């Protein structure tokens, strides 16, 4: 299977150029653009010896499937994204803060989760290989550059990964509406992996059984549920808030 894939949009491509330029194979930029963002891509691509083509909008529309490409598309070597979970854990300077997505298959949701994970300083996003969205151009665009900097680790056996994390001293907190413990009465300041289930289905039974604790997000309005990326942002933000308070 080819490791090449397309990404589009200035956020995603600039993140690649600055964070992982060797993963860029070539870039296509809309002709006639002389704005600062286009110039920044031109200059950085030249500095990193990344092949760049000036093409018309129709070519970019065709390449991106008429997505909102903002006038720039790139081909990347996705194999250079590979990150091992053990490497992530071994190189941290603070207790792990992880986001685990169990059955999130929508690329827009994955992109939004990566974006909030980056904003809240999560060290990695983990998902099972067989029931998850894959990194693609849509994910990269929605993530606004976060897909290029937050490790997205897919695992063959999520239950085994949860056991390995426990052995490494990481507490596993699953989120569910039925939990007795709520987010604002839970100590989320230590080494922690938040587990989010698929919208409408929640966590799978085996995943739930591997959680150390189940936590609910208090709801004070009329809506009964939240988008998975919104929920992810809330729990990660609470972990960060508690860590700041604990540090004094």
Curated annotation (Swiss-Prot):
Its main location: cytoplasm. GO terms for molecular function: RNA binding; rRNA (guanosine-2'-O-)-methyltransferase activity. S-adenosyl-L-methionine binds at residues 197, 217, 226. It catalyses: guanosine(2251) in 23S rRNA + S-adenosyl-L-methionine = 2'-O-methylguanosine(2251) in 23S rRNA + S-adenosyl-L-homocysteine + H(+). Transmembrane segments: none annotated. InterPro entries: 23S_rRNA_MeTrfase_RlmB (IPR024915), Alpha/beta_knot_MTases (IPR029028), Ribosomal_eL30-like_sf (IPR029064), rRNA_MeTrfase_TrmH (IPR004441), SpoU_MeTrfase (IPR001537), SpoU_subst-bd (IPR013123), tRNA_m1G_MTases_N (IPR029026). Its EC number is 2.1.1.185. It is found in: Cytoplasm. It comes from the Bacteria. It is an enzyme of class 2 (transferase). GO terms for cellular component: cytosol. The keyword Lyase does not apply. Keywords: Cytoplasm, Methyltransferase, rRNA processing, S-adenosyl-L-methionine, Transferase. Belongs to the class IV-like SAM-binding methyltransferase superfamily. RNA methyltransferase TrmH family. RlmB subfamily. HAMAP family: 23SrRNA_methyltr_B (MF_01887). Specifically methylates the ribose of guanosine 2251 in 23S rRNA. This is 23S rRNA (guanosine-2'-O-)-methyltransferase RlmB. It comes from Chromobacterium violaceum (strain ATCC 12472 / DSM 30191 / JCM 1249 / CCUG 213 / NBRC 12614 / NCIMB 9131 / NCTC 9757 / MK).
